[in-house]
């Protein structure tokens, strides 16, 4: 058998070729079998987005599971698509327009939408091609976009159904205005940042000589004040309740009212009430039936309800100008620095302004109750379980969802207003086309729906709902959702609510929340901090498999993932090891006869049992979404058991003078290599597929082969335990050589003394050829006098090595004493930490666990070094 494997591991030389091979052979399509179904939807990335490490982690973990299920012969469908991302995409487009001296006002609505579709078509390929680089094995033929016609149909149906049930309504409420986009955003789209600001102390005059002092961080909003509130128990102001004050820089008078909401201890204890621009003031205004005055335009400028000289100014410019005028006219008593939490739109970065506006809302409490019951009944499960608390908190404290957005790009609200009568009709199309509305004129609501309004339908709308399609019947509900913690409410909870409301089922059973990515300093990776790692850089440097394996290996369920670019060497070294070990085997295939009838000896049976154990470990790990454990099982099997032990031992037979022995050895190596490639494939699909293609039948694709299952007939407990004990002998001698800097190539005499009840003596003697190759002894003695030899005790037997002529006893004792002192000091340091109550109460859990592991490690090293010292002294 001949082959043409590359000289060295070079993923750039074959990864694209392999992916195209999978596409050409329809590897990613469901097999439509009668076997158990497994379906999953991917969180749709923004259509104009670019791949970041969070995407990479999410898609890699999804793909590993999908490939595993596909190889387990599940009827597997992984659905992928992109999100139209209303605010984000329109912002990108308007920024592009600005660069060429244009704005959205230069376009009719339909033309504007068409132009954004062109941008979408141009950019969609970027994120999609980047996700392909990860090896994502989603069904390309079923790729969706949230503005596809079928998804628009689903969105409109849901809107109409909720409206008819009284769960969608329109009303005037205080909402969050993003001045950058001119649109409102939901509470969940706001991130709070601590910023340096000012606290202004302003005089509101009652008459020419008396005033009440107000502390405010936003003096520009005083033009929207409709009252001053004080606490009714505040003795300072009791006599002023009911009196009027004049708003500074105006002639407008407002009343002083009493309300228990006012904190007497904050500022001056008197609160300006601006109902149209503060949520607390809005609630106070409802209690006291006072008016609401909006002073802002939708793009964050001051409007006609402020004095003329401030109209049209931005908030920042108005604040600066007002501060000067307040000071000049004697209204400003003082200013001091004030650090405060300010809400920003997480998409645009703009400061959010509370804004009184008429918007569309979904009444969420009735939907949330069902979603909570789904968790309580076990229909829905979170991994790690701790995220259930976040889910419950959000749903237990849910507010109505503002779903209208003042954008052009998105699902236009299917609401129409009669121009003459203001009659409201909910319809997909212009109601005037209906014969019962002949002569009536209608205009459609200009707003679009929140992006999440289409995303919350994703698990079933992407399968063709509201039509009951074959895909919907076959693959809904899906099995698993893999996503990030920060969209548990945005997306996960809402999908559960929508699924229960419109299909009567939870849209998925299991929700796995991926680790939070942090840098090595523990800071969350973010664009603003500039501490992210570009996954494409990692792929270019090390290959996709290296990225995949590292992310999986380090993804501990329930723990943050602190990572830097150097960590990806872990995956690179492993992929390289797989390549080189495979290459060694394939090189030895040349001019060999491959036997089909394999004869397994004790060492083969040990590896078969180890393989069985690995298969069970991987299965259990995936059942509980423990990616790091699954990765470690395959890593340990391949690197330690297969490479370090089995291949090394096989070299004895490969170098035999008997050709049949040689052929049997390489046949068994090839057998185990295929098994290894199969269990590794979900983690490192590119290199395993490449290697497999070099010795498999033409057209045979590894990704479509069946994942190995536990085989009771290949479970040899006795042989496994025998070799396990035998390994302790080899490892102990290797460690001893290493500890005393004796080259592995130097032959030494070794002696063994077995305990009277030791049952593996015959096994040790029968496998002398293996122990000689692995530890390179000169002579081996059994149960003889071992005077003058360095001894080590292990369970069941004692090991002695003749090293006295190879080491300087005095120097070694000095070295070991120094080592002993070093580890004793380290142990004391760790012990003090673990005895410190403050440390145990305040340190992160993973740090405490790390210190505990150090304590155990240092204790073990101290015992080992003490043993060496005692044995050396007895030489």
UniProtKB/Swiss-Prot annotation:
Reactions accelerated catalytically: tRNA(Val) + L-valine + ATP = L-valyl-tRNA(Val) + AMP + diphosphate
Motif interval(s): 'KMSKS' region: 524-528
Keyword ATP-binding annotated: yes
GO cellular component: cytosol
Record motif 'HIGH' region, residues: 45-55
Pfam entry (one): Val_tRNA-synt_C
GO MF annotation terms: aminoacyl-tRNA deacylase activity; ATP binding; valine-tRNA ligase activity
Keywords tagged on the record: Aminoacyl-tRNA synthetase, ATP-binding, Coiled coil, Cytoplasm, Ligase, Nucleotide-binding, Protein biosynthesis
Keyword Ligase: yes
Enzyme Commission code(s) on record: 6.1.1.9
Disulfide partners: none
Binding site for ATP: 527
Subcellular location per the Swiss-Prot or TrEMBL entry: Cytoplasm
InterPro entries: aa-tRNA-synth_I_CS, aa-tRNA-synth_Ia, Anticodon_Ia_Val, M/V/L/I-tRNA-synth_anticd-bd, Rossmann-like_a/b/a_fold, tRNA-bd_arm, tRNAsynth_Ia_anticodon-bd, Val-tRNA_synth_C_sf
Coiled-coil intervals, chain numbering: 803-837
PANTHER family for the chain: VALINE--TRNA LIGASE, CHLOROPLASTIC_MITOCHONDRIAL 2, VALYL-TRNA SYNTHETASES
Matching NCBIfam families: PRK05729.1 (NF004349), valS (TIGR00422)
Family per record: Belongs to the class-I aminoacyl-tRNA synthetase family. ValS type 1 subfamily.
Recorded domain comment: ValRS has two distinct active sites: one for aminoacylation and one for editing. The misactivated threonine is translocated from the active site to the editing site. The C-terminal coiled-coil domain is crucial for aminoacylation activity.
Assembly mode: Monomer.
Protein name in UniProt: Valine--tRNA ligase
């Amino acid at each position: 058998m001949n082959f043409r494997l590359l000289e060295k591991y070079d993923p750039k030389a074959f990864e694209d070729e392999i992916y195209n091979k999978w596409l050409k052979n329809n590897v990613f399509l469901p097999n439509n079998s009668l076997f158990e179904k497994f379906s999953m939807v991917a969180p749709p990335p923004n259509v104009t987005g670019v791949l970041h490490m969070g995407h990479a982690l999410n898609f890699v973990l999804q793909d590993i599971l999908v490939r595993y299920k596909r190889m387990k012969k599940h009827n597997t469908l992984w659905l992928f698509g992109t999100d139209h991302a209303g605010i984000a995409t329109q912002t990108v487009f308007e920024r592009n327009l600005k660069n060429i001296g244009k704005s959205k006002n230069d376009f009719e609505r339909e033309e504007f939408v068409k132009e954004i579709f062109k941008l979408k078509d141009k950019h969609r390929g970027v994120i999609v091609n980047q996700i392909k680089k990860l090896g994502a094995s989603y069904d390309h033929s079923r790729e969706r976009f949230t503005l596809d016609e079928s998804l628009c149909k689903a969105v409109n149906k849901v809107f109409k159904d909720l409206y008819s049930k009284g769960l969608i309504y329109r009303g005037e409420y205080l909402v969050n205005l993003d001045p950058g986009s001119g649109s409102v955003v939901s509470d969940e789209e706001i991130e709070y940042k601590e910023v340096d600001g000012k606290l202004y102390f302003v005089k509101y005059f009652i008459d020419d000589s008396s005033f009440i002092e107000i502390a405010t961080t936003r003096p520009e909003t005083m033009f929207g004040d409709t009252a001053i509130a004080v606490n009714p128990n505040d003795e300072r102001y009791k006599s002023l309740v009911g009196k009027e004050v004049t708003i500074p820089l105006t002639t407008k008078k407002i009343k002083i009212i009493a309300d228990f909401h006012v904190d007497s201890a904050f500022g001056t204890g008197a609160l300006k009430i601006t109902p149209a621009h503060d949520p607390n003031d809005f609630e106070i205004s409802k209690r006291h039936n006072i008016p609401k005055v909006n002073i802002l335009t939708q793009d964050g400028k001051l409007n006609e309800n402020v004095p003329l000289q401030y109209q049209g100014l931005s908030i920042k410019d108005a604040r600066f100008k007002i501060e000067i005028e307040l000071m000049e006219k004697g209204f400003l008593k003082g200013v001091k620095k004030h650090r405060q939490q300010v809400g920003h739109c997480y998409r645009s970065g703009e400061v959010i302004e509370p804004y009184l506006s008429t918007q569309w809302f979904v009444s969420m409490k009735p939907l949330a109750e069902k979603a909570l019951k789904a968790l309580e009944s076990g229909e829905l499960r979170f991994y790690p379980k701790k995220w259930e608390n976040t889910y419950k908190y959000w749903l237990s404290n849910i507010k109505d969802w503002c779903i209208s957005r003042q954008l052009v790009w998105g699902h236009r609200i299917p609401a129409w207003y009669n121009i003459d009568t203001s009659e409201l009709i909910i319809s997909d199309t212009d109601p005037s086309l209906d014969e019962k509305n002949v002569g009536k004129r209608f205009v459609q609501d200009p707003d679009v729906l929140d992006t999440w309004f289409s995303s919350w339908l994703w698990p079933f709308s992407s399968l063709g709902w509201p039509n009951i399609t074959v895909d919907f019947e076959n693959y809904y509900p899906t099995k698993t959702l893999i996503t990030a913690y920060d969209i548990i409410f945005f997306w996960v909870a809402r999908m559960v609510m929508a699924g229960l409301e419109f299909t009567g089922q939870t849209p998925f059973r299991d929700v796995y929340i991926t680790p939070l990515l942090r840098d090595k300093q523990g800071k969350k990776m973010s664009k603003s901090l500039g501490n992210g790692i570009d996954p494409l850089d990692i792929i270019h440097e090390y290959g996709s498999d290296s990225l995949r394996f590292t992310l999986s290996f380090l993804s501990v369920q329930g723990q943050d993932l602190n990572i830097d670019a150097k960590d990806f060497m872990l995956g690179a070294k492993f992929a390289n090891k797989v390549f080189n070990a495979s290459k060694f085997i394939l090189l030895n295939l040349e001019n060999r006869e491959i036997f089909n009838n394999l004869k397994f000896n004790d060492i083969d049976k040990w590896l078969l049992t180890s393989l069985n154990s690995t298969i069970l470990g991987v299965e259990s790990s995936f059942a509980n979404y423990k990616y790091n454990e699954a990765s470690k099982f395959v890593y340990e099997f391949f690197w330690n058991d297969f490479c370090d032990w089995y291949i090394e031992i096989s070299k004895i037979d490969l170098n035999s003078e008997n050709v049949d022995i040689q052929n049997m050895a390489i046949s068994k190596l090839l057998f185990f290599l295929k098994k290894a490639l199969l269990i590794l494939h979900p983690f490192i699909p590119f290199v395993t597929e490449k290697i497999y293609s070099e010795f498999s039948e033409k057209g045979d694709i590894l990704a479509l082969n069946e994942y190995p299952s536990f085989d009771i007939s290949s479970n040899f407990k006795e042989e496994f335990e025998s070799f396990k004990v035998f390994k302790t002998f080899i490892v102990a001698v290797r460690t001893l050589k290493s500890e005393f800097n004796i080259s592995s190539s130097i032959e030494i005499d070794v002696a063994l003394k077995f305990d009277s009840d030791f049952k593996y003596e015959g096994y040790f003697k029968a496998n002398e050829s293996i122990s000689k190759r692995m530890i390179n002894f000169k002579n081996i003695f059994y149960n003889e006098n071992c005077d003058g030899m360095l001894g080590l005790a292990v369970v069941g037997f004692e090991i002695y090595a003749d090293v006295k002529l190879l080491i300087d006893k005095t120097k070694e004792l000095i070295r070991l004493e120094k080592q002993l002192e070093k580890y004793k000091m380290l142990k004391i340091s760790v012990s003090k930490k673990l005895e410190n109550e403050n440390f145990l109460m305040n340190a992160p859990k993973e740090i405490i666990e790390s210190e505990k592991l150090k304590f155990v490690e240092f204790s073990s090293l101290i015992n080992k070094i003490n043993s060496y010292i005692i044995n050396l002294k007895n030489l």
